[in-house]
């Protein structure tokens, strides 16, 4: 196994790139992650209506386009052609994660609150209202849009910077330009694309820099089955975001070829890490951007951790080392 831990520390992995610097899953976010010393990035893959593989997390583009008044500012990725999706622009204004509370982020949903367009206490109050009344995340998003539409538009115009959505090919081409050892966790967000993603990685000579995984069981096994029935590209690694390590997950791991698994921050300890290491499986922590958890990771011998707050982690690490 590669040694992700350096000087007794876990490898920081920028979740969707550095969201403090650019829209998530954008080239700016990925480039800043590399510049800040991340060991790798986590990114997401979906497929357009006409079969183009693209780098995008959400099923719908709306959350990341708030404030931008161009064409196709809402709609599902799977219903849009690449010609249309490539015209979508992702604004910086109002969308960067500049806030870091004193105790960090213990609630994953709060990363995506509209911190950049309203005062903190108002955001907390309004989001509590929206979430208590909504039946799903789409309704929460609609409420945010109605409440803060004009403010997003103002921030977007003031900042002026825009990014576009990357194709998977473009991402792999960028990945190959990074220093040796820099890697990507490639998360598949839907069924039916495993073979195409793996073949694209091989064609772009980026397979040895990739860990292909999913948090959806059916997609995890699609990845595993494809690699069993085809020749797995040299150097390609497979993973799964299992979140917790219980008997069900242990049985699953015994049946597949797993290089790495993701566990939710706070859901595991040294016993789980040791169990997985004995099986030759690397352990990555899913987020948990709190100083207390960052400190705990050093002692748990976790191999890597995904973070939405790479810049803040770097500041914390520098301060910690001066103690």
Per-range role (PLM):
Residues 1-323:
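Phosphate-group recognition and catalysis centered on beta-loop-alpha active-site segments
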């Amino acid at each position: 196994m590669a040694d992700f831990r350096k000087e007794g520390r876990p490898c920081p992995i920028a979740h969707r790139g550095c969201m403090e610097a650019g829209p998530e899953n954008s080239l700016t976010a990925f480039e800043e992650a590399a510049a800040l010393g991340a060991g790798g990035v986590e990114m997401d893959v979906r497929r357009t209506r006409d079969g183009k593989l693209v780098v995008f997390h959400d099923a719908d583009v709306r959350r990341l386009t708030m404030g931008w008044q161009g064409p196709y500012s809402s709609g599902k990725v799977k219903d849009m052609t690449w010609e249309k999706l490539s015209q979508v622009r992702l604004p910086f204004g109002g969308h960067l994660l500049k806030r870091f509370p004193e105790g960090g982020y213990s609630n994953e949903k709060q990363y995506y609150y509209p911190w950049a367009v309203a005062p903190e206490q108002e955001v907390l109050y309004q989001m509590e209202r929206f979430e208590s009344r909504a039946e799903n995340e789409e309704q929460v998003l609609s409420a945010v849009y109605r409440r803060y539409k004009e403010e997003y538009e103002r921030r977007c115009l003031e900042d002026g910077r825009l990014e576009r959505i990357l194709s998977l090919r473009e991402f792999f081409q960028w990945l190959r330009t990074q220093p040796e050892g820099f890697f990507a966790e490639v998360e598949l967000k839907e069924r039916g694309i495993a073979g195409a993603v793996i073949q694209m990685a091989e064609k772009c000579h980026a397979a040895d820099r990739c860990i292909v995984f999913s948090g959806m069981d059916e997609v995890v096994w699609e990845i595993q089955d494809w690699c069993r029935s085809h020749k797995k590209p040299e150097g390609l690694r497979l993973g799964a975001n299992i979140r917790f390590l219980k008997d069900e997950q242990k049985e699953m791991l015994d049946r597949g070829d797993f290089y790495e698994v993701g566990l939710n921050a706070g859901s595991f300890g040294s016993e789980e890490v040791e169990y997985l290491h004995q099986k030759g499986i690397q352990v990555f922590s899913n987020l948990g951007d709190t100083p207390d958890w960052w400190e705990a990771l050093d002692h748990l011998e976790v191999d890597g951790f995904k973070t939405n707050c790479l810049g803040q982690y770097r500041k914390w690490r520098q301060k910690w080392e001066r103690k």
